[in-house]
Regions:
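Short helix-capping/hinge SLiMs at alpha-helix to coil transitions
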Residues: 17-21, 67-68
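A short alpha-helical element within helix-turn-helix/winged-helix DNA-binding domains
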Residues: 27-34
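Beta-hairpin "wing" of winged helix-turn-helix
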Residues: 50-65
Length: 148
């Protein structure tokens, strides 16, 4: 399973802003995180609309987090940047076969598990993992649980 480029780039950008802790220009974020600048600007609009970042226009403008890194989850970023409609808004067949109902139930269960897991990981968790990476690698431990 892979994230869309928009989600991965958005996570890179928001994590960079969390690490810096100050206003960063779009050029700085794009260069440091290897994100095409025009694409970053589009993603930043979505992240701003979702209340994840502040965007200040102008010569001394740029981006910063709109709230503390411990209050922004991976799910928040994912939801801000994905284009899919939530499963609850998708058209379901009224007279669905048992097979279709089973498939829908399985997909819904996977989606719920993924959302629960992603909501448990905050930007602060990711920053701590980056800072602890060397000791984690040496000890063989991981900071994030692997879904069973």
């Amino acid at each position: 399973m892979h994230f869309k480029a928009s989600v991965e780039y958005g996570m890179r950008a928001v994590l960079y802003l969390a690490e810096k802790g100050s206003i960063c220009s779009s050029r700085e974020v794009a260069d440091e995180m290897s994100i095409p600048r025009d694409y970053l600007i589009q993603l930043a609009q979505l992240l701003r609309n979702a209340g994840i970042i502040h965007a200040r226009p102008g010569k001394n403008g740029g981006y910063s987090l709109a709230k503390d890194a411990s209050n922004i989850s991976m799910l928040d970023i994912f939801n801000a940047l994905q284009n899919d409609r939530p499963r609850s808004e998708r058209k379901e067949a009224e007279d669905a076969s048992d097979l279709l109902q089973d498939i829908t139930a399985a997909c819904s269960a996977v989606e719920r598990e993924m959302e629960e897991y992603m909501s448990s990981i905050t930007l602060q968790n990711m920053i701590e993992r980056i800072h602890d990476k060397e000791s984690d690698t040496a000890s063989g431990s991981t900071r994030f649980r692997t879904p069973a």
